[in-house]
């Protein structure tokens, strides 16, 4: 499994992080680490380390980008 560090922006409302976590699981990913970087003005920025099968994060990024209000800011292989 390859690991990727993702920084995402998401709405600061109940259930937003749960939706992201479910999408990561749907794409076959496993969250290895999570931290809240910023939380203000109705938006949050979170750092995640996610392990995925294979080495191409395209499916994971497509699933995350399909969630309304969620934006992948950056992605890099760990």
Give residue ranges: language-model regions.
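A conserved regulatory-domain signal marking ACT and ACT-like small-molecule sensing domains
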Residues: 1-78
């Amino acid at each position: 499994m390859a690991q990727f560090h993702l920084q995402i922006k998401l709405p600061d409302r109940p259930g937003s992080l749960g939706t992201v976590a479910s999408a990561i699981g749907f794409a076959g990913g496993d969250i290895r680490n999570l931290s809240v970087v910023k939380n203000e003005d109705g938006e949050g920025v979170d750092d995640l380390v996610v392990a995925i099968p294979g080495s191409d994060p395209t499916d994971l990024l497509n699933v995350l980008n399909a969630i309304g209000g969620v934006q992948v800011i950056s992605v890099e292989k760990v």
